[in-house]
Amino acid sequence: MKINLIAVGKLEKEYLNLYLSYLKKISFFATINLIEIKEINEKNIDLKKQKETELIIEKIPKNSKVYLCSLQGQEKTSEDFSLLFNEDNLTFVIGGSNGVDESTFLHKISFSKNTFPHQLFRILLVEQIYRSFTILKGIKYHK
């Protein structure tokens, strides 16, 4: 199984060790490919969102089912989220600080109605991916 994470911006050092620890755990079940998009330096927010969305679209692998992580997305429990991993090729998109052009994305998921720093959300996402595999494989982790 291939999982792609496309995120605007670079993961900061203080989050890296925790991120890598989850990647190591996930590697028993799937390959995760992190694609970082450089944040556009643009004062016009709409133009910035449009440009970053275009850069994201260019990086989406062919035949991949894409999920935008969005406050406007459908909330899922951990069990429901784990069902997404019946697909072979998934891509999760984390937009920049100003978001993306949401009309471009068909599938949107939400982990909460709360707003998280994008750095922290990457950790949350990989933790939920790991949790999903433990649910599907019956490994004692999820309670």
From Swiss-Prot:
One of its GO terms (cellular component) is cytoplasm. It catalyses: pseudouridine(1915) in 23S rRNA + S-adenosyl-L-methionine = N(3)-methylpseudouridine(1915) in 23S rRNA + S-adenosyl-L-homocysteine + H(+). It is found in: Cytoplasm. Keywords: Cytoplasm, Methyltransferase, rRNA processing, S-adenosyl-L-methionine, Transferase. GO terms for molecular function: rRNA (pseudouridine-N3-)-methyltransferase activity. It holds the Pfam family SPOUT_MTase. S-adenosyl-L-methionine binds at residues 68, 95. InterPro entries: Alpha/beta_knot_MTases, RlmH-like, tRNA_m1G_MTases_N. It comes from the Bacteria. Its EC number is 2.1.1.177. Belongs to the RNA methyltransferase RlmH family. Homodimer. Specifically methylates the pseudouridine at position 1915 (m3Psi1915) in 23S rRNA. This is Ribosomal RNA large subunit methyltransferase H.
